Structures are given as structure tokens and as C-alpha cells.
Amino acid sequence: MSMTNQQRRPPIRQYQGEAVTYIPLTELHPFPDQPFKVREDKAMRETVESVREYGVLTPAIVRPCESGGYEIVSGHRRKRACELAGTDALPAIVRDLDDDAAVILLVDSNIQREEILPSERAQALKMKLEAIKRQGARHDLTCAQVGYKSDGKKSVQIVAEQSGESKSQVQRYIRLTELSPQLQELVDKKQ
């Protein structure tokens, strides 16, 4: 049985002060142009086994879709692990996020992973930079959603500080996005 946003299951628990709800996998949609690939590698196999044994320990973060269901902001790998483990729902925190806040949260929740290809990091940093630039004078409206203030800094400096990269390294990564997909693949393969 499919549930609408209004009919979703009641919260099952609290996670860091937020209500967690089981959402059927069929109602979860990937974030558009999400730069991080969901690989079915050893780490995924281990995640699937963990989901089978313990369930999903950290809930996904989703936002309601206007067309129904939910868009995954953080939790694409957990959703795939649930599919492979044979479960039908994913514990998630539902947040009302505008597009820019969702992009920033998506990038921030994935950028520190160890297995990120240079092209993925480049696209993620570019997405975050563009989202911060779009916010412009609206930092006061969205800073609570993403947890920072600009303090008059340039967008690229904010991205650099939050990603642990230098400003020039962030700019180099972003230039990678201008390469053809074939050249990006060669960079990813270190060729």
C-alpha cells in the first residue's frame, strides 16, 4: 500500500532531536544530478549485511516532493542497501529544505567519504558553490537550514573552509567539471 506524505507512518523514534519515520522505498526518489555514484562494491556488501543484521542505524534525510513521495538528500547508499537486503522501507528524517539548502546538505553529508572520485568531488563542490552563490543576500534565510553564516566571505572561501581544501584546490576541482566526460574518466583513473 502506498502512502502519501500526509499518510506516512508515525515517527518510530528520535534521532538527535528529530523524528524518524519509516518511508516505503517506492516513495523515495534520487536527488536530481546527484554527483555521488552508488557503487555495489565491498563497502556496499558490508552495508547490506549490516542492514540485514541490525537495520539502518542512521536515518536518511529526505524532503517532500511536490509530485508525491520524497527526494533523498542524504541516504542514497542506505536506500540501495535496503533494496539489496530485501527491506521495504527506510528510516528517514523529513525536512522542508529549499533547493539550495538541499544541495548544500547533500554535498556536506557526502564530501568527507573516502571513496570519492575526483570527478564526483569536483561536481559536488561546484554544486555547493553555485547554491551558496544563489543564496546571495539570503544567507539569513537559509543559514539555519545548513548551519553556517557567510561572515562576508566569498562563496569559494566558504566552500574551501567547509571541505577542508584550499581555495585554489577548490577552484582546480571545479575546473575539472569543464572537461569532457572522457577526460574526467581518465582523471578518475589517474591516467
Language model regions located:
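Amphipathic, charge-rich alpha-helical segments that serve as recognition/docking helices
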Residues: 36-37, 44, 80-178, 184, ...
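The C-terminal cap of the DNA-recognition helix in HTH/winged-HTH DNA-binding domains
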Residues: 53-56, 179, 188-189
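Short, charged/polar connector segments at secondary-structure boundaries
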Residues: 1-95, 101-115
